[in-house]
Amino acid sequence: MRFQPVIGLEVHVQLKTDSKIFCGCSTRFGAEPNLNTCPVCLALPGALPVLNQKVVEFAIMAGLATNCSISPTNIFARKNYFYPDLPKGYQISQFDLPICLAGHLDIAVGDQTKRIGITRIHMEEDAGKLVHGQGGGSGVDLNRAGTPLLEVVSEPDMRTADEAVAYLKKLYQIVTYLGICDGNMEEGSFRCDANVSVMPVGSGTFGTRAEIKNVNSFKFVKAAIEYEIARQCELIEDGGKVVQETRLFDPNKGVTRSMRGKEEAHDYRYFPDPDLVPVVISDDWIKRVKNELPELPEVKFNRFLTEYSLPEYDADVLTSSRPLADYFEQCAQTCNNAKAAANWVMGELTRSLNDNGIAIEDSPVSPAQLAGLIKLIDGGTISGTIAKKVFEDLWKNGGEAAAIVEQQGLAQVSDTGAIETAIDQIMAANMGQVEEYRGGKDKVFGFFVGQVMKAMKGKANPAVVNDLLKQKLAG
């Protein structure tokens, strides 16, 4: 029997606010345990929540960027369950009236575009964290309790692990472009639960789903979904039944393992939180937030195609992150050579950043410095080979490309007399190759170019070298 996978994602986006969703405590990651807490975080008697307005604005931004409708009135609800890192005995979330509804994202699937529906986006608080000790005991760190989250719930529209990863990357790109999430997946700022089921091909009835909790990398999401699909298919083929449950992915072994039975909504006994009034969002508020939205990735991609005449591949790479796009654009506007700027940013710069584990925001070579280097190439002052050496110097020592070229005497030689002398000497020393070229062996030409450049220590103008060589070798 052939099976069709059905996949839906619930993505938790940690918002980049200075303070928590219902109190003024810091959201800074990595503080000493229980340092960033207060009576609200600790659920002490009489402590009341006060909603952080910035969280609502970030939620509106996310909704607009994912083509959702914004609910004019939405309420917070208590999601009741017991866990040691949940001090109140409930989580403040949203249920019946979330802030964003009925959106979508379009993803690339091969040469086609597929639309993935977004059921809802709602605001909620994060729980604390259990810290397991070596002696068998566990501590509770409530620094994270009350950190603001958006939960983005997709429709079950994905049919492969690759589609799920494409959707996840698109959403990640959007929330980081918006500046509402730092995107640090290792710290849990962007993580997802994957709901996976399988059904016979041609069937219109979804199978029983399993939820894979808290997967925090694109690689692991793909691996977890692929394993779970294979597990369910094998189970059904062997005569078993898929149980609705929550599972965890073990990245070391590449398998999912049962964690607990999957709860339904009624198990959480949702009801409106009496300590929080409904949030009313006016049209004027939505318009103001919309006017403040940054240029989104898809719009920027299309603009790079038209404004800078870039190939689709270049535009796609350069708009993959907002800092990368900003760096390229500053460089291109300064040097007036967009294609060269794209090549250097995607080539030498990205390679150096990756080799040294540095984010582009912290690049030792600024857009202006790189633009200065490109101008020297375009002006014929240095060759591409010399430019790479100058870039290395800029990376290590800073400064300006023009000053480095002058100080180190790296300007390329365009003097025909000096180049002709080098060509004559090389031809005289390699008459066999000269005869081969004149006999029709064109590939030998590259040998002569290399020898001349070597003799001129890489400083000869390649265009002048080519022209003079052709004349000399023609006899």
UniProtKB/Swiss-Prot annotation:
Query: Which InterPro entries does this entry report, sorted A to Z?
Result: Asn/Gln-tRNA_amidoTrfase_suB/E, Asn/Gln-tRNA_Trfase_suB/E_cat, Asn/Gln_amidotransferase, Asn/Gln_tRNA_amidoTrase-B-like, GatB, GatB_C_1, GatB_Yqey_C_2, Gln-tRNA_amidoTrfase_suB_CS
Alphabetically sorted, this entry's keywords are: ATP-binding, Ligase, Nucleotide-binding, Protein biosynthesis
Swiss-Prot/TrEMBL GO biological process terms? glutaminyl-tRNAGln biosynthesis via transamidation; translation
Tell me a Gene Ontology molecular-function term this record carries. Answer: glutaminyl-tRNA synthase (glutamine-hydrolyzing) activity
- PANTHER family given for it? GLUTAMYL-TRNA GLN AMIDOTRANSFERASE SUBUNIT B MITOCHONDRIAL AND PROKARYOTIC PET112-RELATED, GLUTAMYL-TRNA(GLN) AMIDOTRANSFERASE SUBUNIT B, MITOCHONDRIAL
What the protein does comes down to: Allows the formation of correctly charged Asn-tRNA(Asn) or Gln-tRNA(Gln) through the transamidation of misacylated Asp-tRNA(Asn) or Glu-tRNA(Gln) in organisms which lack either or both of asparaginyl-tRNA or glutaminyl-tRNA synthetases. The reaction takes place in the presence of glutamine and ATP through an activated phospho-Asp-tRNA(Asn) or phospho-Glu-tRNA(Gln).
Q: Any idea what this protein is called?
A: Aspartyl/glutamyl-tRNA(Asn/Gln) amidotransferase subunit B
Q: Which organism is it from?
A: Trichlorobacter lovleyi (strain ATCC BAA-1151 / DSM 17278 / SZ)
Q: Which gene encodes it?
A: gatB
